[in-house]
């Protein structure tokens, strides 16, 4: 079976729709999917997409502005020990762009209301560090050669000042 290349962007927490799309196109192990950022926020299933992308060897991702906002907010969350600290300018910007559903899904995933606070605190700190490491591992662009053509895949544009 021939390898197919698919490119998508701005999933914004819509894991169910992503699954439906992949089923509809018959996405398989021979195919490759490039996600051009913004898997988080606005939709109900950001955590599901986050883990799905990491589990799949044939899915490649670059960071978008929502991942950048999330990373900045998570870095501040380590300082204030709060995912949605209103003291955080990065969080306020992230919140204006749909962060609350992501924060809610993180709290649900970490079972905030089901475990003792001390355990939740430790689990949250580990999770935040994991998210920061994941976002830091994402490139800002991907170069792809396909059918004798060279492509540069980006989220929203190229800044010549950023390597």
Regions found by a protein language model. Give the residues of each.
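Feature recognizes metal-dependent phosphohydrolase scaffolds
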Residues: 1-163
